[in-house]
Regions:
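N-terminal type II signal-anchor transmembrane helix
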Residues: 1-51, 89, 108-109
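Non-catalytic, structured segments within soluble enzyme domains
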Residues: 22, 27, 111-366, 532, ...
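Short active-site loop at a secondary-structure junction
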Residues: 67-72, 389-399, 422-427, 450-470, ...
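A penicillin-recognizing enzyme superfamily signal
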Residues: 78, 289, 293-296, 300-302, ...
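Active-site SXXK
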Residues: 82-83, 229, 299, 359, ...
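Short, well-structured active-site flanking segments
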Residues: 91-101, 174-177, 236-239, 476-496, ...
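Conserved catalytic neighborhood of penicillin-recognizing serine enzymes
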Residues: 110-135, 186-189, 256-257, 435, ...
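Mid-domain, small-residue-enriched loop/turn segments at the edges of structured enzyme/sensor domains
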Residues: 500-506, 537-575
């Protein structure tokens, strides 16, 4: 009896000592424990998703893929699979399972290793939310106390829902919703018992039990899950027998991107990071952009096709690599495919290896092990590239170009496969809605995988003749008209700084004598632009460009500005052209229309300032002082006259003016009115002539009329010195687009090609705006305007139409006439008299007027 008594006393003492120790340990650790009450309002890390204007997913950013689901959305069989596998006594314990701990300890004692886990689902939840993954005794103790607290705070159902959304299941998938998508491309409610069991088996070792890493291990682990479900009575013997014989059809499924717009998506990502920091990737933001699938894909296709066409006509630079030489032992298929899989794809270009070649055909293997045939049709274009201005002879047989062992690039053209190469030239396209600045499409390069540099917004490139419409607008605001006569003859002037004559030339070097300003712009006459620049003054012209949103620091104050020596981005150029298309308003480009939080609440909605040419909104710069000098035909006085230069209105005054308009007109804010609406119409009309010309001459953009088969468009070519940059920018109903093409390496120019006859409809000759950039503009605008009714140019109030003589710009007095637009009060008043043009004397040298 004494023994029993002592034993009981000892047991009680041990229990009290143990309880006291546990309590003391708890008191010691308690200050270090996080507040589990945060689980009541927990925000799971959800990736940022970017959508098109019509709700299609175009990008997703965030380290963790998670698709939150409620417990009601998860099939009961899946919940039971996790409970059977991870915590069969889940509904019986209070956070910590002594029975489970004893069972795991017993197995470990008798087997010599820990084959069963002792952590309950609640403990795993505590670990996943609050603790590090390190394996230490202190972490385990904290885990136990936290689990008990969690059980006191949350219901079993709340614990399960958090656990099933939080648990890591491999391949960046967090939660069962993401795992169902990653491995099977399904939502959780679409999963079979087989697939549920696979996912339920992942928490123990997601990196090794997943079916993408090891199918054998995945099958074995699935069968363990099924066995435990059978033991717990969650499935029948028949279900067990049938399911364990089923194959696991798993593949990696990326987020369901409807279409890709990588350059614009990256702009959105940067903007979101600037606003919200790292939480942008974790808080489940949904961002809706201004682009749509049809328009964006048309832009990407237009740019890629144009770049590939340019690259093909300049010749083939040879294989990307030689895997084995002719005469050496060929690589086996596995080695070939492993090598090709390590290479990226660029748009439509796929890496391939030539496995056989004869004069008529070559066979190439792709990364997936399939083979394609390259006939002479797909190789004929590949005459040797010698330089940007020289190409070799057209190949006569396939083996002139391809040999076995070469690593090449191929692309599919219709049903055939063609040889290709990764272009060295690059391009950008920006398209905006001129009424409100919404970005309709944006392409920053040939392929985002090739280069993440966004040429649409970051590349400052000389604009060449793309600048002329802005400068002619300045000249007309100063007093010139579309009928003003300017002399198209060569110019030569001593440049003291350079120590040589400055001799701007037309391209091509053809001169027509006295011509109207409309023709000067339509045919892109360089010397005519220089004379107009001299007439209005360089400083006035340079400052006037700021009205179109061009940064002052990028504008040179020299006569070379007339030829486009200023450097702007395609986005800036498109914004400037929008002013001419929308009636004179400077809209701000924007690309995020709405931001929602993870609950669907709208936390941002764009309210762009819009153009309103029909509104009575004054020009914020006031009326430009007209130059009497122009009427007096005295060029030099205009050029040196500083008191007549344009003076910019400070931005605070512009904002005050806009606020006054808002108060007057209501909630809608209007973009700054930077040039008067009649003047904007005149230059818009002149851009139309650049495409359609007049009887007797073509505009430099004539191909757009041929390709689009509509007359409500306008645009302007642009080519810089030595053809280092080529542009085409212009408008159509509801859209303004600018396209640039060139090399990132500023030392290279776009060069010259000769016709080979091997490429259908090949462009040849010197590269420039019309040949190198305009094809992309035409293709894109044709797609965007398909089905859009023509909208003839309609003169706004303040414009009068006068029949003028095309040779003199005066009132018509015969058959050589056309209708011309004038701002009321600037139309000619004298009848045309045909006589020889006047010259004036400048510094002792004969100098033609303007």
């Amino acid at each position: 009896m004494k023994f029993v008594k002592y034993f009981l006393i000892l047991a009680v003492c041990c229990i009290l000592l143990g309880a006291g120790s546990i309590y003391g340990l708890y008191r010691y650790i308690e200050p270090q424990l996080p507040d589990v009450a945060t689980l009541k309002d927990v925000r799971l890390q959800i990736p940022m998703q970017i959508y098109s204007a019509d709700g299609e997913l175009i990008a997703q950013y965030g380290e963790k893929r998670r698709i939150p689901v409620t417990l009601d959305q998860i099939p009961p069989e899946m919940v039971k699979a996790f409970i059977a596998t991870e915590d069969s006594r889940f509904y019986e314990h209070h956070g910590v399972d002594p029975v489970g701990i004893f069972r795991a300890a017993s197995v470990a004692l008798f087997s010599g290793h820990a084959s069963q886990g002792a952590s309950t689902i609640t403990q795993q939840l505590a670990r996943n939310f609050f603790l590090s993954p390190e394996r230490t005794l202190m972490r385990k103790i904290k885990e136990v106390f936290l689990a008990i607290r969690i059980e006191q705070l949350l219901t079993k159902e709340e614990i399960l829902e958090l656990y099933l959304n939080k648990i890591y299941l491999g391949y960046r998938a967090y939660g069962v919703g993401a795992a169902a998508q990653v491995y099977f491309g399904k939502t959780v409610d679409q999963l079979t018992l087989n697939e549920m069991a696979v996912i339920a088996g992942l928490p123990k070792a997601p990196s090794t039990f997943n079916p993408l890493y090891s199918m054998d291990r995945a099958v074995a682990r699935r069968n363990v899950v099924l066995s435990r479900m059978l033991d717990e009575g969650y499935i029948t013997q028949q279900q067990f027998d049938q399911t364990r014989t089923e194959a696991i059809n798993a593949n990696y499924h990326a987020p369901e991107i409807a279409f890709s717009a990588p350059y614009l998506s990256e702009m959105v990502r940067q903007e979101m990071y600037n606003r919200y920091g790292e939480s942008a990737y974790e808080d489940g933001y949904r961002i809706y952009t201004t682009i749509t699938r049809k328009v964006q894909q048309a832009a990407q296709q237009a740019v890629r096709n144009n770049v590939l066409d340019y690259d093909m006509r300049h010749g083939y630079r040879g294989p990307a690599n030689v895997l084995w030489k002719v005469g050496e032992s060929a690589w086996d298929n596995n080695k070939i495919t492993d090598t090709l899989k390590a290479l990226p794809t660029y748009g439509p270009l796929l890496p391939a290896a030539v496995t056989s070649a004869n004069p008529q055909e070559a066979t190439a293997m792709l990364a997936d092990g399939s083979t394609v045939a390259l006939s002479m049709e797909g190789v004929r274009w590949a005459r040797p590239y010698r330089s940007d201005t020289q190409q070799g002879p057209t190949p006569r047989k396939v083996t002139d170009v391809l040999q076995t062992g070469q690593q090449i690039w191929v692309r599919q053209v219709g049903d055939a496969w063609w040889l290709a190469q990764v272009p060295e030239v690059n391009s950008a396209l920006v398209s905006i809605n001129p009424q409100n600045g919404a970005v309709m499409a944006l392409v920053g390069g040939f392929d985002f995988n090739q280069s993440k540099f966004n040429r649409a917004t970051q590349a400052l490139r000389q604009v060449g003749s793309n600048i002329k419409p802005f400068l002619y607008t300045a000249a007309m605001d100063k007093g010139l008209t579309l009928a003003s006569m300017l002399n198209d003859v060569p110019i030569s002037r001593w440049d003291a700084g350079a120590g040589s004559d400055w001799q701007p030339k037309n391209s091509p070097p053809q001169y027509a004598g006295l011509i109207r300003l409309r023709q000067g712009l339509g045919q892109s006459k360089n010397v005519v632009m220089v004379r107009a620049m001299r007439a209005m003054g360089v400083d006035y012209a340079a400052e006037y460009l700021q009205r179109f949103g061009f940064p002052a620091q990028n504008i040179v104050h020299t006569e070379s500005l007339a030829l486009g020596s200023a450097s702007f981005t395609p986005m800036q150029v498109a914004r400037g052209y929008a002013v001419m298309a929308n009636g004179g308003f400077l809209v701000d480009p924007w690309f995020i229309s709405k931001i929602e939080n993870d609950q669907g609440g709208v936390i941002f909605e764009a309210k762009p300032k819009v153009a309103c040419p029909e509104c009575d909104i004054p020009v914020i710069y006031g009326d430009t002082q007209k130059s009497n000098v122009l009427e007096n035909n005295d060029v030099e006085d205009v050029a040196i006259s500083r008191e007549q230069q344009n003076v910019s209105v400070p931005m605070p005054q512009l904002e005050q003016a806009n606020q006054a308009l808002v108060a007057k007109t209501g909630a809608q804010e209007y973009a700054p009115h930077v040039i008067n609406t009649p003047l904007a119409f005149l230059i818009k009309s002149a851009l139309n002539t650049n495409i359609f010309g007049e009887p007797g001459w073509q505009g430099t953009g004539w191909r757009a009329g041929r390709d689009l088969q509509r007359r409500d468009i306008g645009g302007k070519t642009g080519t810089t010195n030595s053809s280092k940059d080529a542009w085409f920018s212009g408008y159509g109903p509801g859209v303004v687009t600018s396209v640039w093409i060139g090399f990132d390496d500023h030392r290279r120019n776009l060069g010259h090609t000769t016709a080979s006859g091997a490429i259908k409809d090949q462009i040849s000759g010197y590269e420039g705006g019309a040949k190198s950039a305009q094809p992309a503009w035409d293709a894109y605008m044709k797609a965007v305007l398909e089905g859009v009714p023509e909208q003839p140019l309609t003169p706004p109030p303040g414009i009068v139409t006068v029949n003028i003589d095309r040779s003199t710009g005066q009132l018509a007095n015969g058959g050589n006439s056309r209708e011309e637009y004038f701002i009321e009060g600037t139309q000619p008043t004298q009848q045309a008299v045909h006589e020889v043009g006047t010259t004036i004397i400048d510094n002792g040298e004969a100098q033609e007027l303007f």
